[in-house]
Structure formats: structure tokens, C-alpha cells
Amino acid sequence: MIRSTLPLFALALAISAPVLATELVPVPQFRSVELRGGGDVAVVPGPVERVTILEGSTQFTHMYVENDGQLRIDACNERCPRNYQLRIQIQSPRVPNLAVSGGGQITTMGGFAPEGHLAVAVNGGGKIDARSVDASEVSAAVNGGGELLVRPRQSLAAAVNGGGNVRYWGHPSVSMAVRGGGNVTAGY
């Protein structure tokens, strides 16, 4: 009896185990990125746009580019296992505009050339840390909770609706609108 249940136990363990192999995801050119439903995305400088799943799988995570040039990352489909972990690395010659919806985190890494403008947004929870981006102007919006961390050189246009935080570093001119709670504050 022990012999017959052992393969079933091993199969159940294998099905529930996280997928750890890296996977290069072919996607067409994009101008912006939206992470939906959780996960961690690192945006790093590179010679071409490239998306790599470091932890997770395209079995459960769907990525596609909309007509407007937005790379959408749907973290978990209906077959997603419990405790599914998603980590993605996006390489790009320029920093794309960034958005998180329904949880998750996007972090930019240093080494990008200075940008003229960067737009970042969080809707329904999540975090974007773009402090490593040297952008002249930043547009930042939080709706329904979340946090944005940015470093604009000249100007910041920030909006918070229904809770959330926009924190900025440097000494930009700041225009802000806060409705229903939230903060736009200098970082330290």
C-alpha cells in the first residue's frame, strides 16, 4: 500500500511546487508596462526590449502588448497555484511608463540615460519605486491605495485619490491634488 500512494504524493508535491526555471517571453515592442494582480518586476537597462520570467511561468502569467504599445502582465490566470510567486525582469534601452493595478511592485534599476518625462501610476494597491530614474518631469497618480517613489529633476505633477502616497526626492516644483486621503511628501 505504501508503494501505491508514494507516486500520488510525489505527483501532488510536484504540481504544487513553484516553477523556478527562467523563461524568455517573446513580446513585440512596447512603450509602457502595466503589472496586474501581483508579482515583482525589475526594469533594467539593456540594448533591446526583453522580458524574462525569473520565477513563475507563462502557464499562469499572461503577457501581451496592446495596440497603444502597453505591455500588460496579468500575474495569475484561473489555473494559478496557491502561493504562486512571480518575478520578472524587463530590459529596455529607455524607461517605459509604469503602472501597477491590483497589487504588485515595479522597481527600476540604475544605469538608464536621463529621461524627459516619466509617468507612473498605481490603482487599487501596489508600489512603484522609480527613484533610480533621472527624469526631468514626472507624472504620478495613486488611486485607491498604493505608493509611488520618484526623483524628478524639474517638476512633479502628483494626484492621489482615495488614499495612497507619492514620495519624491530632489527639489522639483510640485503641483498636487489630493482627494479622499493620501499624501504627497518629500522623501528623506
Regions found by a protein language model. Name each.
Residues 1-188:
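Intrinsically disordered, low-complexity terminal regions
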